[in-house]
Amino acid sequence: QNNFLNEERFVKSFVRGRFNQKKWGRNKIKMALKQRQIPEQLIRIGFVEIDEDEYLKVLKELFVKKQEELKSETNSFKKKLKLRNYLLQKGFENELIFDLMR
């Protein structure tokens, strides 16, 4: 029981920190926690720490920032590919990225 509570506290703190400081998406956070052998149910509990509106706001901010960096890229296909890959690498879900890029 006590160990579970300590792990839960760790997971919540980890999720908050990685999202707020490093701007990681759920997929990247989940992979990092799985590498630490954290159970799936604890990971789901940890994701409660991420506000959905804030999550989408961060995704849009990263999208706009990367778009600015890629201004000089003339090939629109390459630009979209680089944008998508960047956001996937940050751990955001493919569906959300796809919706944002439409």
Question: What kind of feature is each model-predicted range?
Answer:
Residues 1-102:
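An alpha-helical, amphipathic repeat domain used for nucleic-acid recognition
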